[in-house]
Amino acid sequence: METGHGIKYRQLHIEDYLQEIPAEQGRVSGVYVHERITGDTDTNTNFWTNNLLDTILRSDNLNAAYKRVKANNGSGGVDGMQVDELLPYLRQHRDELVGQLRRGKYKPNPVRRVEIPKEEKGKVRKLGIPSCVDRLIQQAISQELTPIFEEQFSDNSFGFRPGRSTHDAIKRCKQFAEEGYVYVVSMDLQAYFDTVNHSKLIEVLSRTIKDGRVIPLIHKYLKAGAMKDGGFHPTEEGVPQGGPQSPLCAN
């Protein structure tokens, strides 16, 4: 079986083992957050955005990403690898995988397209299930990007954000009502995840991310395509629902 980066994957059955993480990192609602980002100066933030790939590929960040993927479980992607097979694979191929990422040679797999019927007749929600290796890499990316971009998001935004829930949004609405606001606008961005403009997204990300190795990697994931019924479908727009980095990119 081939992975997206051309390495043959052999199914192995070894008891789970994970190297110790040197320092415990902060988490908010189960999402990994680097304490070094919050409350830091612009100079420090610029340092991390300029050297972002190095922090993404740090052992402690990859270990935390593996733990999150393992905890979430979920089904496998197009290469057939299951979550419980990921650790044995990483033991054998981690250095080669990290090397390909550093050199910009890594090629993500297409996502596995799954369609979930909506309540509205004839409508479906399109999910894109990444391979386990791609899920790990996306999770590692998301863990580093989240604390950086959280500082830029609106305080009145609650969707797909760590430490924020529907109940928090309701409390904010109640607060506005008590402050005298009397109008509510209700709207739905139809097929939002499926129609995110790639060029605009890359432009927005590039304003903050100054590491020229990270933007191309994210772009590869956006353009990786999808497999459905044995056929390849290119992705010219949208971020696939089902990948760890998609909620952050959508926001």
Describe each model-derived feature in a short phrase.
Residues A65-V69, A140, L217-L222:
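Short alpha-helical scaffolding segments that buttress acidic/His motifs in well-ordered protein cores
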Residues K121-Q139:
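Glycine-rich active-site/cofactor-binding loop and its immediate structural neighborhood
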Residues D54, A71, S75, T146, ...:
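Amphipathic alpha-helical interaction elements
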Residues Q139-N156:
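Electropositive, glycine- and tryptophan-enriched low-complexity nucleic-acid-binding patches
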Residues Q138-Q139, Q143, Q241, Q245:
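Glutamine-centric residue-chemistry signal
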Residues Q100-E115, K123, Q152-N251:
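Conserved polymerase palm-domain catalytic core
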Residues M1-Y89:
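Non-catalytic, polymerase-adjacent accessory regions of viral genome-replication enzymes
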Residues S75, E85-P110:
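Amphipathic alpha-helical blocks
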